[in-house]
């Protein structure tokens, strides 16, 4: 049999078999074209499940008159010009087959106008002849595409369409997927003249949670964990079903790569593996969005672009796994560590995180301006809204060290009255709590101390503990105590050798010529610090670091360390000071710092007590009374 070239109409119908599977496929291709055109609103109208009519209207950039006919031909696109463009593609469409394929199996009308044109133009194309007629029309800036009588010229394909209800369900499901990815777009859907979906732009987090509730259900929106993680060129964001709310298999499973919805077994495996430590056999719900360098992912794998191929699939898998595990671990810790916010809280606040702590008599210093504060409210707020956040390390609230002023400013009148009340207040006994304590691994040594934690004194101005002894009132700097406790913890662990924590994603940096010699000469010191380094293919691989460096920028910190130890072998005191500086944000509440202080030896406690500053409260009260 002789080889013959297929006629254009037959070739387009064959291509349509891959691209146009059902009405939902048509809507997918047309809406993606609208988004590529920069539309901020997309209106979808269908009749009889899309078999009778599909109309997509947008406010995008439009198509010039001279390009209308070309837009309906095969392999015509404005998305790319060369192979390099394909390797770095970020748009939804790029093959130039959608409009040609749709017009070959339907009666298609394309109306469009650009901002530069004074009038719109309309292109008509029918599947039989593939001839395009261009006529003037009335239309605002943007485009409208109508596909009438889908599969009218391919009866076999039309017979395979399901009921109107089933086809509408497929369309509705696809719209949910794209609405989750493009929160900035206003989507509407009409079926048989009735508006059934109206997704308004979700420009704030609260609005997006509302959209999440519309699409994924109220239960998912109320219990999901916020994911926000960035490492090098990878960024993962979205929402994950809470382990406490997950059960069985969830249909809410959406994964996007650079804004494109894909089906990938890699992410499903990472999610199930992350959940395996809480419950076996759970396939939880998630809405996850991965952003990465387009050169690191191939989207030209499937005709319908449902699949992608990662150049470093194992690296992406481990990255997603670590981000999800960190988010779930943090949510578990927050549920234990953080009490509901009271109406009046101070900057340093007690919480049952490290042991039973007596209630404090808080002093409202809302009018004062402390130089630095440590706010548990901020921690709770950011954790509940942002979940996991970090650049390769675990979530960490920020402790802003208080500045050490040589003089204490005069307190407010409210504080003076509170000082007097403190003197007449009976001591409060330590109360037990039913909340199970689960200290982090790096605090295990601190928790095993034999020293008991006394009741924590009140906190004032977000910076100081108020110490009352007989008729004396003193202020003890919390930041100073936290620093001393941290140094004591490091010193105790350094004496035995700090146990390094392996990085799930090792950090690689270009190696300097003298680094191999430094690592070899200082191997004992690095092992004592819990740091494991290796050199391979001209790269320095950071495999393990002590817990005090987990939140540091290792790519910059480790070279500085190597340069430091190259010149001299530092003393233990210098190493302790350096580690303490890197882990300045160690304690995340006043109660943690107080518990660490209580675990210090008596002589160290006395020395720190001696650094407290006595307040001349009697003089202030006399002056206050004389003023009256």
Curated annotation (Swiss-Prot):
Q: Output the Gene Ontology terms for molecular function.
A: ATP binding; ATP hydrolysis activity; ATP-dependent DNA damage sensor activity; mismatched DNA binding
Polar residues bias (residue ranges): 343-353
User: Sorted alphabetically, which InterPro entries does this protein's record hold?
Assistant: DNA_mismatch_repair_CS (IPR014762), DNA_mismatch_repair_MutL (IPR020667), DNA_mismatch_S5_2-like (IPR013507), HATPase_C_sf (IPR036890), MutL/Mlh/PMS (IPR002099), MutL/Mlh/Pms-like (IPR038973), MutL_C (IPR014790), MutL_C_regsub (IPR042121)
What are the record keywords, sorted?
Answer: DNA damage, DNA repair
> Would the keyword DNA damage be found if you checked this record's keyword annotation?
yes
Q: Where is this region: Disordered?
A: 335-411
User: GO terms for biological process?
Assistant: mismatch repair
Xref: PROSITE patterns: DNA_MISMATCH_REPAIR_1
Gene Ontology cellular-component annotations: mismatch repair complex
Q: Does the keyword DNA damage apply?
A: yes
**Cross-referenced SUPFAM superfamilies:** ATPase domain of HSP90 chaperone/DNA topoisomerase II/histidine kinase (SSF55874), DNA mismatch repair protein MutL (SSF118116), Ribosomal protein S5 domain 2-like (SSF54211)
Name the job this protein performs: This protein is involved in the repair of mismatches in DNA. It is required for dam-dependent methyl-directed DNA mismatch repair. May act as a 'molecular matchmaker', a protein that promotes the formation of a stable complex between two or more DNA-binding proteins in an ATP-dependent manner without itself being part of a final effector complex.
Q: Which NCBIfam families match?
A: mutl, PRK00095.1-1
UniProt record similarity statement: Belongs to the DNA mismatch repair MutL/HexB family.
Name this polypeptide is given = DNA mismatch repair protein MutL
Q: Please tell me the species this chain comes from.
A: Shewanella pealeana (strain ATCC 700345 / ANG-SQ1)
Q: What is the lineage of its organism?
A: Bacteria, Pseudomonadati, Pseudomonadota, Gammaproteobacteria, Alteromonadales
What gene name is listed for this protein? mutL
């Amino acid at each position: 049999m002789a080889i013959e070239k297929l006629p254009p109409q037959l070739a387009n119908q064959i291509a349509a078999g891959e691209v146009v599977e059902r009405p939902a496929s048509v809507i997918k291709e047309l809406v993606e074209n609208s988004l590529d055109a920069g539309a901020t609103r997309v209106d979808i109208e269908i009749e009889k499940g899309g078999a009778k009519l599909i109309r997509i209207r947008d406010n995008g950039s439009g198509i010039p008159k001279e390009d209308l006919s070309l837009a309906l031909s095969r392999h015509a696109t404005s998305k790319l010009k060369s192979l390099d463009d394909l390797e770095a593609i970020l748009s939804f469409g790029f093959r130039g087959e959608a409009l040609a394929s749709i017009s070959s199996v339907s009666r298609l009308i394309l109306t469009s106008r650009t901002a530069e044109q004074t009038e719109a133009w309309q292109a008509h194309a029918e599947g039989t002849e593939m001839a395009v007629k261009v006529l003037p029309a009335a239309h605002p800036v943007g485009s409208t595409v109508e596909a009438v009588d889908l599969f009218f010229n391919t009866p076999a394909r039309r017979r395979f369409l399901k009921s109107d209800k089933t086809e509408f369900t497929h369309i509705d499901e696809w719209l949910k997927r794209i609405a989750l990815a493009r929160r900035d777009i206003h989507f509407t859907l009409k079926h048989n003249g009735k508006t059934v979906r109206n997704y308004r732009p979700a420009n704030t987090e609260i609005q997006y949670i509302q959209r999440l509730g519309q699409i994924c259900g109220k239960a998912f929106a109320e219990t999901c964990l916020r994911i926000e993680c960035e490492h090098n060129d990878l960024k993962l964001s979205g929402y994950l079903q809470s382990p406490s709310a997950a059960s069985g298999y969830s249909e809410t499973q959406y994964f996007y790569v650079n804004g494109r919805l894909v089906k990938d077994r890699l992410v499903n495996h990472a999610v199930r593996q992350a959940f395996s430590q809480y419950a076996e056999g759970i396939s939880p719900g998630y809405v996850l969005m991965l952003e990465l360098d387009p050169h690191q992912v191939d989207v030209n794998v499937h005709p319908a672009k449902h699949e992608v191929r990662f150049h470093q699939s194992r690296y992406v898998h481990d990255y997603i796994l670590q981000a999800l595990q960190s988010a779930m671990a943090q949510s578990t810790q927050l549920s234990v560590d953080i009490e509901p916010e009271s109406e009046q809280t101070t900057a340093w606040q007690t919480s049952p995180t490290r042991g039973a702590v007596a209630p404090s008599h808080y002093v409202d210093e809302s009018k004062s301006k402390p130089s630095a504060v440590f706010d548990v409210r901020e921690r709770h707020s950011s954790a509940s809204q942002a979940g996991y956040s970090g650049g390769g390390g675990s979530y960490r609230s920020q402790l802003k060290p208080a500045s050490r002023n040589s003089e204490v400013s005069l307190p407010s009148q409210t504080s003076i009255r509170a000082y007097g009340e403190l003197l007449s207040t009976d001591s409060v006994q330590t109360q037990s709590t039913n909340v199970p304590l689960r200290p982090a691994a790096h605090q295990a040594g601190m928790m095993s101390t034999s020293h008991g934690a006394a009741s924590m004194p009140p906190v004032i101005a977000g910076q100081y503990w108020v110490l009352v002894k007989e008729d004396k009132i003193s202020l003890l700097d919390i930041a100073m105590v936290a620093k001393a406790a941290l140094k004591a913890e490091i010193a105790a662990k350094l004496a035995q050798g700090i146990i390094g924590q392996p990085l799930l994603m090792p950090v690689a940096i270009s190696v300097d010529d003298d680094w191999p010699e430094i690592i070899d000469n200082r191997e004992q010191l690095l092992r004592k610090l819990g740091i494991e380094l290796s050199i391979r293919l001209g790269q320095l691989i950071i495999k393990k670091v002590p817990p005090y460096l987990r939140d540091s920028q290792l790519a910059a910190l480790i070279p500085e360390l190597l340069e430091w130890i190259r010149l001299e072998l530092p003393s233990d005191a210098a190493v302790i000071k350096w580690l303490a500086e890197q882990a300045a944000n160690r304690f995340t509440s006043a109660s943690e710092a107080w518990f660490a202080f209580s675990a210090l030896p008596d002589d160290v406690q006395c020395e720190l007590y001696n650094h407290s500053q006595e307040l001349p409260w009697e003089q202030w009260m006399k002056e206050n009374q004389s003023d009256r």
